[in-house]
Amino acid sequence: MTLGPIMLDVVGTELTQEDIRRIRHPLVGGVILFARNFESPAQLKALTDSIHAVRQPPLLIAVDHEGGRVQRFREGFTRIPPMREFGKIWDEHPRKARQLAEEAGWIIAAELRAHGIDFSFTPVLDMDYGESQVIGDRAFHGDRQAINELAFSLMQGLKRGGMAAVGKHFPGHGYVVADSHVAIPVDERDFDQIASTDMQTFRQLIDDGIQAIMPAHVIYPKVDNKPAGFSERWLQKVLRQRLGFNGVIFSDDLSMEGAGVVGDVTQRALAALNAGCDMVLLCNQPDKADELLANLKWDIQAQSLARLARMHGGRHPSSMVALHEDPDFMHAVHRVGQVGKADGDLPFA
């Protein structure tokens, strides 16, 4: 059975029969995990093993594990600071900031891969304009050069740990105040303004080989009246053709308020897939998941399957014990653990 175009969540810390029924459906290609799915490192590894055992090829398993306030697994995992902290260091010590960002990426990937997670939806490539609370300290900086350097470093660290990177939220979510989880944000800038600022960070990371991108549930009415994640203009004409992106396009969560302008859950999924998404996410609404699985008609294209296959995690440590026996890894954990503390404590070794 090939991977399908839908990524769903599961209810709790172990699979229920309803979970298994859903993720066995041929339209499903992945599972996204949340904090409610985590009790302990051992339980998490058992859960991912059970998810991977349901299908061949195994389903993709993903998580939002950016650091700061968006880190789903905490006990037994290294606390990763918000990305803004690396930006603060970059202002004074760019080389050290790049080194620390790369180490943070390595830690994120290695720890998640040791627990059977294929990838995290990270890094955030949005610019920090100081207005968006939902982005806020999740962004590296307000300066494009800082974002480019730090995001590239984080991506290199993820790669070292066996994990692909997912840049978000194309073409930029940082300029709008509204939170697309609960509202429909509108960015009134014209295309040239966006292309010369926010979009440049995506262009650079695409040139650097980023493997996946997630578009924003933001409407840019001077470009298209649909949110970017449902816009063929943004995804095909700009992202694919103009920027030359050949990786995976993941929709943001179809249950978010910012997706509501498109219609019901099936209409949302169809709109995203037709616009150019390879895989759509639907989270926290099992009844809507059942509705989508019952009603969506979609034959996934060979090109999408090839892209998605590259999101499976690479080589990884057999366990956290093995990681903790690696002195280089533990030194990285110590250095990243100092980020965000008083300047005098920064690990400038």
UniProtKB/Swiss-Prot annotation:
What compartments host this protein?
Cytoplasm
Which keywords label this protein? Cell cycle, Cell division, Cell shape, Cell wall biogenesis/degradation, Cytoplasm, Glycosidase, Hydrolase, Peptidoglycan synthesis
Show the taxonomic lineage: Bacteria, Pseudomonadati, Pseudomonadota, Betaproteobacteria, Nitrosomonadales
Just give the chief location class: cytoplasm
Domain of life where this protein originates: Bacteria
Q: Which organism is it from?
A: Methylobacillus flagellatus (strain ATCC 51484 / DSM 6875 / VKM B-1610 / KT)
Concerning Gene3D superfamilies, the annotation shows:
Glycoside hydrolase, family 3, N-terminal domain
- Name the Gene Ontology molecular function terms of this record: beta-N-acetylhexosaminidase activity
Q: In which pathway does it act?
A: Cell wall biogenesis; peptidoglycan recycling
Q: Give the enzyme's EC designation.
A: 3.2.1.52
Identify one Gene Ontology CC term for this UniProt entry: cytoplasm
User: What name has this protein been given in UniProt?
Assistant: Beta-hexosaminidase
Identify the coding gene.
nagZ
EC top class, as a word = hydrolase
Among PROSITE patterns, the record links this protein to: GLYCOSYL_HYDROL_F3
What are the catalytic residues? H181 (proton donor/acceptor), D252 (nucleophile)
Q: Where does substrate bind?
A: D64, R72, R138, K168, H169
| Membrane found in the keyword field | no
Q: Where is this site: Important for catalytic activity?
A: D179
Query: Any stretches that span the bilayer, and where are they?
Result: none
Q: Which family does it belong to?
A: Belongs to the glycosyl hydrolase 3 family. NagZ subfamily.
One GO process term, biological-process aspect: peptidoglycan turnover
Q: What does this protein do?
A: Plays a role in peptidoglycan recycling by cleaving the terminal beta-1,4-linked N-acetylglucosamine (GlcNAc) from peptide-linked peptidoglycan fragments, giving rise to free GlcNAc, anhydro-N-acetylmuramic acid and anhydro-N-acetylmuramic acid-linked peptides.
* Cross-referenced Pfam families: Glyco_hydro_3
